[in-house]
Amino acid sequence: LDLDHFKEVNDQLGHMAGDQVLQETGLILKSVVRSTDLSGRLGGDEFVLFIQNAADRRGLERCAEKLVSALNRTFSSAEYSVTVSASIGIVPVQGGESFAQLYEAADKALYEVKRTRRNGYQFAASAAEPVL
């Protein structure tokens, strides 16, 4: 998961505002995913989520839709107001894939969303192909 246009937050409003948006994003992620799921910040404006026991593709879609909706919002304080959205790349675990394969597949799907529309999600084609 990547925040859309986050660089502008830091560039226009400063790193304190950016840090506040990142902290609030973490709280939103925690509130949307189940207690059995795992979410964390990788760095910058990039987050990773592990959704445990997703029953099927539709369950992952529902989770992604909730996340996109919850993160498409205006963050405000006395000093600033900025609207941020999120793009998400999804890769279902089939079994046997390495973390590198899963990460690369999700990253490709994420950047396809960012390239074509932003504020949405896309499933990866496959994570089973070897990483070169």
Stretch-by-stretch model annotation:
Residues L1, F47, A86-I90:
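A structural signal for short, well-ordered beta-strand segments
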